[in-house]
């Protein structure tokens, strides 16, 4: 419901984003389990197991996972599904910052959201927290460079 708006605002702020619905490589665009079988709701666990590593599913997974590796931050836009939650958990485990934006009318309380960096309920607050984190990360990188003398006048 809010996906396109959030994506547009982040792009307008000059953030490079990954749009899983419209990736740059259009051949990988629009993966859906329904592409493999018309009635996935009737699948048994065994049916799912057999299709989990279908070439189309594997290509889509690799595309998404590559984007996760390349990302600096993750925005978990609520409400969302299991895949988004798995991605956010993996990214946090990799030490990346994860911001939750909950635009639902009635939130579903979740204790594990405490592990993430911020829980916002307004898009403007999300943008501010990303900007603050970006600036903080830049400062830390600058300090690290200066600490190792790679940016000092002595090396010129």
Model-predicted segments: where are they?
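Conserved catalytic or regulatory cores that recognize and/or transform ribose-phosphate-containing ligands
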Residues: 1-156
């Amino acid at each position: 419901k809010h996906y396109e708006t959030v994506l547009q605002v982040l792009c307008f702020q000059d953030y490079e984003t990954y749009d899983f619905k419209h990736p740059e490589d259009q051949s990988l665009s629009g993966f859906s389990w329904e592409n493999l079988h018309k009635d996935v709701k009737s699948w048994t666990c065994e049916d799912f197991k057999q299709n989990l590593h279908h070439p189309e599913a594997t290509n889509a997974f690799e595309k998404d996972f590559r984007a996760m590796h390349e990302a600096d931050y993750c925005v978990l836009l609520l409400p969302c599904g299991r895949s988004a939650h798995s991605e956010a958990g993996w990214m946090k485990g990799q030490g990346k910052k994860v911001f939750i934006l909950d635009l639902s009318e009635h939130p579903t309380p979740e204790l594990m959201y405490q592990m993430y960096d911020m829980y916002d309920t307004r898009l403007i607050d999300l943008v501010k927290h990303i900007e603050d984190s970006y600036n903080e990360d830049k400062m830390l990188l600058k300090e690290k460079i200066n600490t190792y003398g790679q940016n000092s006048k002595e090396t010129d």
